From Swiss-Prot:
It comes from Azotobacter vinelandii (strain DJ / ATCC BAA-1303). Keywords: Decarboxylase, Lyase, Magnesium, Metal-binding. InterPro entries: ICL/PEPM (IPR039556), Oxaloacetate_deCOase_bac (IPR023687), Pyrv/PenolPyrv_kinase-like_dom (IPR015813), Pyrv_kinase-like_dom_sf (IPR040442). Gene3D superfamilies: Phosphoenolpyruvate-binding domains (3.20.20.60). Binds 1 Mg(2+) ion per subunit. It comes from the Bacteria. GO terms for biological process: oxaloacetate metabolic process; propionate catabolic process, 2-methylcitrate cycle; pyruvate biosynthetic process. The lineage of its organism: Bacteria, Pseudomonadati, Pseudomonadota, Gammaproteobacteria, Pseudomonadales. This is Oxaloacetate decarboxylase.
Length: 287
């Protein structure tokens, strides 16, 4: 992909943010899935951090994938993508200075946008996996990320966890990220429209929601009315691919069908239970 075409895809993404429509992001995890999503006329795709960890490392979402590994996968996708790609940049792979490097590398990889979250990652000793960093530290990361980008069309989206915060705290964080210059606000943990409508009217930036297919938020027109421009309904395509691979290999091996769900397969083959034991035993981490 040329620099010019990268710039064009970033402009396309900004047009989505500036529209009055809510778009359903395709979960992409490799070049083939990105090409399929583009052929099916999805307006935007997302490379999730959890999916990247599964695809690249066969590991759970424990902040194990490195920046280099994530960027390599984003670069592979960027070479063939004909739709804007959002990169889930987790916590920026460190502090504000690390986040600057993350932005630089992902910009070169060709992504149209990236999300930076305020979760305390990797989890610290004795902390919960959902703990957040202090607000001033999170604001510093957003400011640093904006400073690091070269193409002004690259969108920097600040992400927070509404499930861990009160409505007032969520609004406060989102407003602070807006004031720092974030191009959009991404929220996870919105329970339903009542929850969303208590927050959205207080914000000016375009919104992105990660809903994991929550049926209580399954109304694209109503999402759009509340300023939501991008919705991520989870990574069903990836899980379906894992399930199909498992079932086909079982059939080829002659061992018959399995009752294991896609989620159960990902837990099993990412050895998630083993990592949970390690986290409890060595770090006193509580999920």
């Amino acid at each position: 992909m040329t620099i010019a075409s990268q710039h064009d895809l970033r402009r396309q993404f900004r047009a989505l943010l500036e529209s009055n429509t809510c778009y359903d992001a395709a979960s992409v995890f490799d070049p083939m899935s990105a090409r399929i999503a583009g052929d099916l006329k999805f307006e935007v795709g997302i490379l999730g951090g959890s999916v990247a960890a599964l695809q690249v490392l066969a590991a759970p979402d424990y902040a194990l994938i490195t920046l280099s590994e994530f960027v390599e996968q984003a670069t592979r996708i960027g070479r063939v993508a004909c739709l804007p790609i959002i990169a889930d940049a987790d916590h920026g792979y460190g502090n504000a200075i690390n986040a600057m490097r993350t932005v630089a590398e992902l910009e070169r990889a060709g992504v149209a946008a990236l999300t930076l979250e305020d979760t305390l990652l990797p989890p610290k000793y004795g902390h919960k996996t959902t703990d957040l960093i202090p607000l001033d530290e999170a604001v510093g990361k957003i400011r640093a990320a904006l400073e690091a980008r070269i193409d002004p069309q690259l969108s920097i989206i600040a992400r927070t966890n509404a499930e861990q915060l009160s409505v007032e705290e969520t609004i406060g964080r989102a407003k602070a990220y807006q004031a720092a210059g974030a191009d959009g606000i991404c929220m996870i943990g919105i329970r339903d429209f009542e929850h969303l409508e208590a927050i959205a009217p207080h914000l000016d930036a375009p919104l992105m929601l990660i809903t994991y297919g929550n049926p209580k938020l399954n109304d694209m027109a109503r999402l759009a009315e509340n300023g939501v421009r991008i919705v991520v309904n989870g990574h069903a395509a990836y899980f379906a691919a894992i399930k199909a691979t498992y079932d086909r290999l079982r059939e080829q091996r002659g061992v018959g069908p399995s009752d294991l769900s896609a989620k159960e397969l990902c837990i099993k083959y990412s050895t998630l239970d083993e990592y949970r034991v390690f986290a409890r035993e060595f770090m006193n981490v509580q999920e």
